[in-house]
Structures are given as C-alpha cells and as structure tokens.
Curated annotation (Swiss-Prot):
Protein name, as recorded: Uncharacterized lipoprotein MPN_588
Chain residues carrying a lipid of type N-palmitoyl cysteine: C23
Disulfides per UniProt: none
Organism for this UniProt entry: Mycoplasma pneumoniae (strain ATCC 29342 / M129 / Subtype 1)
Region (Disordered): 31-51
Principal location: membrane
Amino acid sequence: MRLQFKLLGFLTLLGTSTILSACAATQPNFEPNNIEESGPITPTTPTTDVPKPTAEVVPVNRGFHFQTNKVPSESDVFKHNYDLTFSLNFTNKSNDIYGTGWLFDWKGDEKALGIDGSFVPSITSNIDNSLLKDDQFTVYLATNLHVADALRNDQDYEPYKKDQNKQDFTENTKTEFFSLGKYLEGEQLKQYISKEENQSANQTDKALVSIQASNIPKTAYTATDFVDMNSYSYNNITTSLPGNYADFAVIEVNLNLKNQRDQQILHDFVKPAIKAYKALGDTLELFSAKPLNQFIEQNYYLLGYPVINKGNNTANLLLAQQKSFDHNNSDHNQKSQWFTKDQSYINKLDRIPVLTNNYRAYNESTGSQLFANQQNESWLNGVVIQDKGVVNFASFSNFTLKYHEKRFQQYGYGLMLNDTNFPGGSSGSPLIGKDNKLNSIYFGVLEIYQSGSLARNDIGMSQILRTPQNDKGSSISKGSYDLIFGDKNTKNYYAKFAKDHQTHLYQKIKESKDEQFRFVETQETTNNLGN
C-alpha cells in the first residue's frame, strides 16, 4: 500500500512512501511588458504561442464535482468565505504561479475609507483624501507556505530578502508581477468594466477580474521552525531535517492610495473582506482554538480558486498597471511593479482560477465532513495514522517542503476532509466551520494506493492554525501551538510581527483581557520595520 500526498502543482517532494506536491498551480511564463518603456498597456498578440497551464499531470477534472462560478447571496453559507478570499498570482521569468489567499490583518485609516463592505466601482476615487492620515493602506493576506515560496522579493523584510541559505535570489526566480483576482458577475461586473479602456470586446456576464498591485508584496510571517520538534514527536519517529513547518504564511501588500489600481483593490476587494472579517468576529472571535476531538462533529465550508477549465462563459480580465498611474513608493521601502501581462495572453488561456466551493450537486451536500473509514476500508488504518479525521503530521516523517531552498518537515495537526479534492490553485483557501470560526487552511489532497492501484483520491487536507493548551480530549495530542497569537510552546507566531508593525490584529490584542490572546505582551519582540 502506498500513500501519495498531492499539493497539486509546481512543487513536488518525494519520500519513501509518500509524495508531497503543491496545491498551487503553475504554468510556463511569457516575456512580460515593461511599463517604463511601453507606457499604457494595450492588448497585443504575443510573438510565440501562449503556453497552457501545467498545474497537474493527471486530468484536472479527476472526480471534480464542485460548484463553480456562483457568487454567493447575502444569506448563502459561503458568503463570508467569498468576501474574504482572493486568487493570488505570482509571476517570474520562468513560471506563472497561482494560489488562494484571504484577508488576515490590515493597517490603515478605516474611517477615511468609509468601510461598509458595499461594492462601489472605484475608477473614480471614493477616498476622502481630507481624512487620510497617510496615502498607504497595508493588507495582510494568509496563504500556504508553499504558495508564499513563489514570493521572492530582494526588497523584502529580513530574512526573506534572500533565500534560506542567505544567497541572493536568481534572476529567473525573482517575483516580477503580482495580482489579486476575484470572480464577479452580472451588474457588478458590468459596472466594473464599463469605464475601462480596451475591454469593449470582453463584455460578458461572468469574469475573473485580476488587478495588478503597484508593489511586489513582502513576507510578514512564515510558519517555519514554529515549535520545538521534540514536543511533537510521534511514537519516537525522528527526522534528519533540522527545521519544521506548518503550511501557513502571511504576505504583506502595500497599497498606494494615489494609484488607481490599488484604489480598486482596496475598495472593491478589501472593503468587503473587512466587513466579512468583522462579521465573523473581528480577530478575537474569528480564529478557532479548541481540543482536537471537538473538530470531529463539524461541517466545514471551503471556497477557493483552483485552476480548471474556464468554460465558454467566463472571461479572464486583467486590470494592469500603467505608466501614468502613481508609482511613488520610495518613502515606503516598496518595490514597484514595472512589468505586466498582455490582455491577449490572458484571453487565450483555457484554464484559469475559477471560483469553487464544496457544494456538490450530485448529492446536494454542502460542506465537508472529516474522514471516516468505511466498513470495507479497514486496511486504511495501516496506511494513514489518524484519529477520526485528525492527523498529527509528525507521524508522516517524509512530508517535507522546500521553502526558499531549505527543506522543512511538516509538523502540527491537520484535518482530513472527505470528498474534498480541490485541484491546484486552491492552496491557501480558508476552512470555516459550522460555528462560523476559521480553524484551518487548506493545502492539498491525499491519494491512497492499494496493490499499486489508486484506492482513494478524494481526501482534502488542511493545517490547523491554533490548538489549545492542556488538550486531553484527543489521543494524538501531545502539545499545543498557536501560529497566530502564540503560546508557551510556539517559538514563531504572527502576533510578534503584528506588534512590531502595530497592525489591526495587534490593536485587538491590546483591547483584550483574555490571556489566550495576550501571550505576545509577555514576550520581548524585535522591531522588524526595516527593509
């Protein structure tokens, strides 16, 4: 029997009995346009054939039966997931890489933005400049570590401006293009593109709208070396690798409010996300931390942007940066984007990020339950070490990942989601429980082989973000960790960055009297505000 673990995309990791490959999607790249030389971007025909995405070796529709291209209504169970979540696109000279991200934190003047979550096309600015304290608004997006591996910015924060071996990034791997995408339809879409130049041929009632930010993102946090590995050993299983990881990272996107595209990102993408974030509990009530055994009797809702066939009625529209837009970011230690893609290239792609949720029309089921063996599958107990769908990643010694040229072993705990095999590009999607708490982040698919034949390929995997201390409710729980707020067992957690940068999440920590959120206040942190 063989266990294969697919993250479904550009990153493939081999082990003796398991394979870990990325649930982000990748395709060969083209030569991007240079805004500095060409001025405003107009569609042109590429001189070479447009390459097709190569997100997976196996057919993309392997058992795919999920709902796509449906914007949730206000009462829909997926509405908050939709508002929070975006398609992420990182491009370098070699590859075009897609993943999914969601609003995790922010820093900026909310009052000046009039944040109410409503959709307001922002071709003309909706910002009350008289109220602005600064011309910047910073957004922090959560995704998988294996997606954040695609971000290679030589003006990033330390230690991320070089690889893990302290070597400069190669020219072919440096990030040159970044965009946020969201699926829009109907009047919302028509209003959006009606004022855009060069979009007259793209009148459609459905589209993935991608907006190129003015800056290349930076790395706020990676869940690398986040625990003492000895605290999470399983049956004395050891590893030769010196580091550990959870498949979780946070990237920083700095928005220049004088830049037209950044204004659009803020008003049309970020404002609804902030509204959803606050509706779900605004930091302190949003992120679940509960004993592992309490995950079992839950239903989990998943929404992301896997790369699949776009269909005849779905366009892929790129709102690119232009030379005429404001790119004055020298005072903010940002790396401006000077490259973009041709709309003609975008139009020819037959596989794009497609809005997908885990509703299944074939049996009218919504959400996902944790994995449970069927009566005829008792043999799985000898292949997958799990407790009613909860796994300790320390039991899989060869689940490893290379991040910025250093290999790490996966640690912490995760969920096995039955009948939830989202394809590549969905990596980083948030998992929200029936209790409206965000508990984990989706990262891949488990494939199980019996006698050389594929027996199961429908088990989705997610990484739990927080586990409580003193957990006695689960047979596989040995220690706690908290990737967001920290605890005594967690060496590396996001709240340290939030405190150094005085973000919204840290402001909520300061307001709280609950000790589970205030661990960072008991620790010394190192200010990391340099570039």
